[in-house]
């Protein structure tokens, strides 16, 4: 309820959060609490989605959570693939 799945720091000491999601469809199921958290905390917050149907991992910034809720995986991710996600988080 209200706390993302991962609370982390990168090597530069920058704090970030990640909400983890898995979906079989294009829809990403987000609770009202998860949406509210990312609306209130739009910076250095992320949603990492494992799309089973596409066998891919997509990373979205918290500031686009309303669009992610409305559009699902049709929304362009900030990073695509695990290595790209790691690189982006390390660059914060």
PLM features: residue spans?
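Nucleic-acid nuclease catalytic cores
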Residues: 39-67
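Hydrophobic beta-strand residues in large extracellular and virion-surface proteins
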Residues: 18, 47-48, 59, 85, ...
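Mg2+/Mn2+-dependent nuclease catalytic core
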Residues: 23-42
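Beta-rich catalytic cores
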Residues: 2
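Charged phosphate-binding loop/patch that engages nucleotide di/tri-phosphates or the phosphate backbone
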Residues: 72-92
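Short, exposed beta-strand "edge-strand" segments with a Pro/Gly-rich flavor and a Y/T-containing core
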Residues: 24-29, 53-60, 77-79
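Active-site donor-binding loop signature of nucleotide-sugar glycosyltransferases
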Residues: 20-22, 62, 70
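Conserved catalytic cores of phosphodiester-cleaving nucleases, focusing on short active-site segments
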Residues: 6-8, 13-24
